[in-house]
Amino acid sequence: MESSPFNRRQWTSLSLRVTAKELSLVNKNKSSAIVEIFSKYQKAAEETNMEKKRSNTENLSQHFRKGTLTVLKKKWENPGLGAESHTDSLRNSSTEIRHRADHPPAEVTSHAASGAKADQEEQIHPRSRLRSPPEALVQGRYPHIKDGEDLKDHSTESKKMENCLGESRHEVEKSEISENTDASGKIEKYNVPLNRLKMMFEKGEPTQTKILRAQSRSASGRKISENSYSLDDLEIGPGQLSSSTFDSEKNESRRNLELPRLSETSIKDRMAKYQAAVSKQSSSTNYTNELKASGGEIKIHKMEQKENVPPGPEVCITHQEGEKISANENSLAVRSTPAEDDSRDSQVKSEVQQPVHPKPLSPDSRASSLSESSPPKAMKKFQAPARETCVECQKTVYPMERLLANQQVFHISCFRCSYCNNKLSLGTYASLHGRIYCKPHFNQLFKSKGNYDEGFGHRPHKDLWASKNENEEILERPAQLANARETPHSPGVEDAPIAKVGVLAASMEAKASSQQEKEDKPAETKKLRIAWPPPTELGSSGSALEEGIKMSKPKWPPEDEISKPEVPEDVDLDLKKLRRSSSLKERSRPFTVAASFQSTSVKSPKTVSPPIRKGWSMSEQSEESVGGRVAERKQVENAKASKKNGNVGKTTWQNKESKGETGKRSKEGHSLEMENENLVENGADSDEDDNSFLKQQSPQEPKSLNWSSFVDNTFAEEFTTQNQKSQDVELWEGEVVKELSVEEQIKRNRYYDEDEDEE
């Protein structure tokens, strides 16, 4: 700093920049660089204020100095002056200030002009306050002066102010304190007592409440401070009318005369930049700044002032507002008129809003203020999200159970594999054509089969495999797809093999291929999704197996495949008819040939089969010839039987004559056995000897060989003599009856019972 008087021009532009633009930045970002710059301006402002006071007192004449000092002396020495003398002194002081602003020194032209303007405003305030006492801003702006405090009290309260204000307010605060030292002595108590003011603001006038309900906060504050010159003075621009009283209009004209003098031509070139920036900011963000300033300071006020307390706690907030306006007035003093009006209007709005809230509001005004502040909140209505439905169950999906997969909305519980119905997550699913699968079944159904040519599983594989009943499959496929889409598949899909077995059993019982295919179809469609190779091949192989099971039905005891087709059907018919007879002895005789044949055919090697065939055919021919003779002799009922039924006639004839020929058979039987030594080693006359002979001859192969030779010999004898032929056959059959044991007869009967059940 130079020792010469400080030139205000350079610092005016810089301080303007700080107060207008960077003041908000300091509060928001707390930038250290800006704070340092601000501290420099703060020191410079203190020095300029001190120089301003000295230059004002030194450069003015004694008349002006004497008038100012007398006003101060009267103010502090005689606090009980009348209102008329006090208003006269205030008018004189205001005229002195105006003349002092008209004739400043050359060095401090702009500085003195701004200081005179601030002093003039602060001196005009008490005059307007005296004439319009019930004002909100008057009580809130300088409350410490109401109680008649001296300068020491004011300095202590200024320390309280410093605690409330931030670093960004220091310059404004100290400059305001220095200016208040000049102006505070000129203001005394109000003519209207505090009790009356208190009642007015507690009860509230009906006009005030109506306006509060009808208008916004700024309009209501303006209505309350209708007679206040401090508000109207700031509101009024050039060519603008106000709704204030006659005194405020007088001061308005005086103010309008002074405004052209304050805007010097030397500063216009510098103010062009700031006019573009500050006016644009104040005009565009007028309402937003107004809301922010009012909202932030109302919160501070509500925290501090919760009761109807003396004006002491209000000093911080009200002085803060006063300093804010005074700082803006210092910056606006060197600006052109339009920019000054814009920024002044914005400051007026922020200032007008404050006096509404620092005072304790009535219930009506509180309700109105709440109702006015609520509409922007009421505009934010709760909008429920759009109703979403689950793709699977078609029910409403709520946010807690919502799952978005494959660009579709599911319930978390409905997000399941369409094949196995297992619950899936976003990491374990695969989708194909809008259907959800778990990864193992997706690979099994589509990837491992390699059916990429058919749309990768979009066309069912059954169409490629099954070609028998295409029409039925075409009808079944859409039904299957519709069922699969409507309801998630149950986990019981693997019951399909059980159904397959049931269908096979039913088809075996029905023995109808058409019915089998129809019943097999649903099992195939279910099996199609599980089994590989295709189930149509399984169905055909299953039917072949069924036929094999029918053809090779086991019989006991087992027979040789070669001997079975050679068994004549007439023997079976005869056996059926013979089976009707009651006695075991009668049933046992015709089975002798068949029993011996069966035993030899089962247990003898295949090389023995030709003699068996030979012996069997010869015995059959002999039986047919004997049956023909018997048919001529016997009754009509036996004659009706055919040659194939010759055994039946023979046995009935034998049954009638068996008693008379028993002894003869036994004798001739012994002679035949002696001739055929290969057949019987130890001859016997009784049945016991025959039984012992059968027991001794346990190996079956020699028995079969001896039996075949015996048959050849007997038939050779039959062909020699015709008369002996019939006797030989009868004796041969009688011996066979003796040879058969009871156990073998029972076995034969059991075997034919099973055969009958089979047929």
From Swiss-Prot:
List the biased-composition ranges (Basic and acidic residues). 96-105, 146-177, 247-258, 516-527, 556-567, 656-673
Tissues in which the protein is found: Highly expressed in placenta, kidney, pancreas, prostate, ovary, spleen and heart. Also detected in lung, liver, brain, skeletal muscle, thymus, testis and intestine. Not detected in leukocytes. Isoform Beta expressed generally at very low levels. Isoform Alpha abundant in epithelial cells from mammary gland, prostate and in normal oral keratinocytes. Low levels in aortic endothelial cells and dermal fibroblasts. Not detectable in myocardium.
Q: Does the keyword Iron apply?
A: no
| Record keywords, A-Z | Acetylation, Actin-binding, Cell junction, Cell membrane, Cell projection, Cholesterol metabolism, Cytoplasm, Cytoskeleton, LIM domain, Lipid metabolism, Membrane, Metal-binding, Phosphoprotein, Steroid metabolism, Sterol metabolism, Ubl conjugation, Zinc
**Where, per the database record, does this protein carry Phosphotyrosine?**
Y229
Q: Which residues form a coiled coil?
A: none
Query: Motif Required for interaction with NPC1L1 in this chain: where?
Result: 164-166
Instruction: Give the Gene3D superfamilies listed for this entry.
Output: Cysteine Rich Protein (2.10.110.10)
Q: Does the keyword Transmembrane apply?
A: no
- Return the Low complexity bias intervals: 362-376
Where is this protein chiefly located? cytoplasm
Instruction: Tell me how the protein is altered or processed after translation.
Output: Ubiquitinated by the ECS(RAB40B) complex leading to its degradation. Phosphorylation of the C-terminal region by MAPK1/MAPK3 reduces its association with F-actin and contributes to actin filament reorganization and enhances cell motility.
Positions with biased composition (Polar residues): 595-607, 644-655, 693-709
Residues recorded as bearing N-acetylmethionine in the entry: M1
Which SUPFAM superfamilies is this protein grouped with? Answer: Glucocorticoid receptor-like (DNA-binding domain)
Q: Name one GO cellular component term.
A: cytosol
The induction text for this entry reads: Down-regulated in some cancer cell lines. Isoform Alpha is induced by serum. Isoform Beta is constitutively expressed.
What are the N6-succinyllysine sites (modified residues) in this protein? K439
GO molecular function terms attached to this record: actin filament binding; actin monomer binding; cadherin binding; metal ion binding
Q: State what this protein does.
A: Actin-binding protein involved in actin cytoskeleton regulation and dynamics. Increases the number and size of actin stress fibers and inhibits membrane ruffling. Inhibits actin filament depolymerization. Bundles actin filaments, delays filament nucleation and reduces formation of branched filaments. Acts as a negative regulator of primary cilium formation. Plays a role in cholesterol homeostasis. Influences plasma cholesterol levels through regulation of intestinal cholesterol absorption.
Subunit and partners? Interacts with NPC1L1; bridges NPC1L1 with MYO5B. Interacts with MYO5B; bridges NPC1L1 with MYO5B. Interacts with PXN; this complex stabilizes actin dynamics. Interacts with F-actin and G-actin. Interacts with LUZP1 (via C-terminus); both proteins restrict ciliation and may work together to regulate this process. Binds RAB40B (GTP-bound); interaction influences LIMA1 subcellular localization in lamellipodia during cell migration.
Return the domain comment text from this UniProt entry: Contains at least 2 actin-binding domains, one on each side of the LIM domain. Both domains bind actin monomers and filaments. The C-terminal domain binds filaments more efficiently than the N-terminus.
The protein depicted here goes by the name: LIM domain and actin-binding protein 1
Originating organism: Homo sapiens (Human)
Species lineage: Eukaryota, Metazoa, Chordata, Craniata, Vertebrata
Q: Which gene encodes it?
A: LIMA1
